[in-house]
Amino acid sequence: MADIKEDIDKGADVIETITGERPLFLRAPYGNVNFIQLNQLDCFFIHWSSSTYDWFREEEEYIYKRIMKEAKDGAIILMHDTREVTVKAVLRAIPELQEQGYEFVRVDDLLSRNGDKLKMGVPYRSCKYDRGAVAF
């Protein structure tokens, strides 16, 4: 557990040095996290309600269709911004989803916009109460 905390702290230090802000949110690799980790790490675990599988199929059309299919009220959609085809698919999907009435928000805004206070040690996957908002 100490190694995991040390790795997270090192990464957070780098991000804080570059941005001036310490990250509070973490997506565990592959979504794998256990209750001990949830309760011993000082961060909010943000997972996802659906995935574009862009790590598996690097095709813009496939990713675009997954975004359009999975965009639902309160959804958190997993994507990887290091893939050019994913960025292209997102840029294509955003205007269409906005026309459908969706708003794009930061994941912490999505999870707290109904007055809920985020809790450490809880793996968040979506916001079941929200209407018309989605986070990527």
Describe every region a protein language model picked out:
Residues 1-122:
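Catalytic domains of cell-wall/extracellular-matrix polysaccharide-remodeling enzymes
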